[in-house]
Curated annotation (Swiss-Prot):
GO terms for molecular function: rRNA binding; structural constituent of ribosome. The keyword DNA damage does not apply. GO terms for cellular component: cytosolic large ribosomal subunit. Belongs to the universal ribosomal protein uL3 family. GO terms for biological process: translation. SUPFAM superfamilies: Translation proteins. NCBIfam families: L3_bact. The lineage of its organism: Bacteria, Bacillati, Bacillota, Clostridia, Thermoanaerobacterales. Part of the 50S ribosomal subunit. Forms a cluster with proteins L14 and L19. This is Large ribosomal subunit protein uL3. Gene3D superfamilies: 3.30.160.810, Translation factors (2.40.30.10). InterPro entries: Ribosomal_uL3, Ribosomal_uL3_bac/org-type, Ribosomal_uL3_CS, Transl_B-barrel_sf. It holds the Pfam family Ribosomal_L3.
């Protein structure tokens, strides 16, 4: 059964294995989350649960959202995200989902918003090659040709300099190294998208089964 949880990125560190190898890991504050809504094939065309995560002042929640939380009989949450599930009957509105749904060694997919880098050139943004850097060359880090003379215009979708980052990114098949249910911490091997404190969606791996 697909499973998932919302979390907040704490930061990166490293842990050592028994044979002395250092493993870079990311610490995530995962959950506890609350099921705010259930979506079924009969009513919505697909099975999913809506999870709430994070504290927020009630004064910062607008009236439509207050009504949404009141119908579920749960306190207001900062984040609401949907996660597709197969067995919708296994969940109930108001049910709490904790980090212990994952086990050590399990593979997960982590989704987040990548760090914003601001305006970047073609080399940094798309991996273009440089031109000659010696004296006499007038072409160093410029994009180069943008198309043929015939159309006399630049086609939509051409790779150009522009804003880099701040995009939804999913990293697949990351290994769960440690689970700490008491402190709601999930330790995952490798890096995950986003800055410290940003929202993450951790789901069971699609390709790592």
């Amino acid at each position: 059964m697909p499973k998932g949880i919302l979390g907040r990125k704490v930061g990166m560190t490293q842990i050592f294995t028994e044979d002395g190898r250092a493993i870079p890991v990311t610490v995530i504050e995962a959950g506890p989350c609350v099921v705010v809504q259930k979506k079924t094939i009969a009513n919505d065309g697909y099975n999913a649960i809506q999870l709430g995560f994070g504290e927020i002042k009630e004064s910062k929640v607008n009236k439509p959202l207050k009504g949404h939380f009141n119908r579920a009989n749960v306190k207001p949450m900062r984040y609401l995200r949907e996660i597709r599930v197969e067995n919708i009957d296994a969940y109930e509105v108001g049910q709490e989902i904790k980090v212990d749904i994952f086990t050590v060694g399990e593979k997960v997919d982590v989704t987040g918003i990548s760090k914003g880098k601001g305006f970047a050139g073609g080399i940094k943004r798309h991996g273009f090659h440089r031109g000659p850097m010696a004296h006499g060359s007038k072409y160093h880090r410029r994009p180069g040709s943008l198309g043929a003379k015939g159309p006399a215009r630049v086609f939509l979708g051409r790779k150009l300099p522009g804003r880099l980052g701040m995009e939804r990114v999913t990293i697949q098949n990351l290994e769960v190294v440690k689970v700490d249910p008491e402190r709601n911490l999930l330790v995952i091997k490798g890096s995950v998208p986003g800055i410290r404190g940003s929202l993450l969606i951790i789901k069971e791996a699609v390709k790592g089964k």
